[in-house]
Amino acid sequence: WPMVATPPRRLIYVFNTFHPKVLALTARGPGLRPWPRTEYVLISAFQKKMLGIEGEIHPSPIDIKRFHPRPPSPDQFAPAARPLVVGRLSRDTADKHDAQDLALYRTLPAEGWQVRLQGATSLREQLPADPALQLTPEGSVDAADFLRGLDVFYYRTGDHVETFGRVVFEAMACGVPVVCHRHGGYADHIRHGENGFLFDTTDQAAAILHQLRHDPALRTSVGTNARRTVEDMFSPSALQARMTFFRS
């Protein structure tokens, strides 16, 4: 039908992947009649840089009413009151996990962490059976409830590169300090040590987790700033500006 349809006034393509083939397919209108130039809406500056194309950047929407912080607890400044929980959430596929993290997961329980990995049953044969190391299927707990149950969110992927990384922002919206590998679209919004943490190596990640474990005030301040960051990203004025782009 596009071959015979009347060309639209504007042609906007919301592009949220890294696949260059998609660019070739969408750069030109179909048929013999002239179509308007394709306008791209991208979801991160990281994606824009990696692809080397022009486009409007609109972060992938997050429901910040659903993903909200848990109420303050009396023991939040008492590290010995309960085991601290570090965890991550993703699809249960091998490309979502980095093999370098296996060694880290093995050591964290001995340091006093409880580790919760939802969407990690694919790692079961590579990790020891340990009550403090929980591997659960993808979707076994509601995402918002799972993230609110963490003290720290940890994230690094394997072959899969996050164009945006929704789950990182969902964790930030829940007021959870995030510790993430630097290579991903989420890194555009993380100010290291202020509203989250970025690392390049496993040793750096381990050092950050050690610091957070022993500094409850830092966990609280970074989590609070993380929530504010996401609120700013999806404020009424920011959402209105994005709608104005489509309506113009």
What are these regions (language model features)?
Residues 1-36:
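Extended catalytic core of nucleotide-activated donor transferases of GT-like folds
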Residues 14, 18-20, 35-73:
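Donor nucleotide-sugar binding/catalytic pocket of nucleotide-sugar-dependent glycosyltransferases
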Residues 62-141:
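Conserved catalytic-core segment of nucleotide-activated headgroup transferases in glycan assembly
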Residues 72, 216-247:
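A charged, aromatic-enriched C-terminal amphipathic alpha-helix characteristic of glycosyltransferases
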Residues 144, 166-173, 187-188, 194:
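Short alpha-helical segment that forms part of, or immediately flanks, the ligand-binding pocket
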Residues 148-163, 176:
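Acidic donor-binding loop of glycosyltransferase active sites
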Residues 177-180, 198:
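Short hydrophobic beta-strand element within catalytic cores of glycosyltransferases
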Residues 192-203, 211-216:
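Conserved acidic donor-binding segment of nucleotide-sugar-dependent glycosyltransferases
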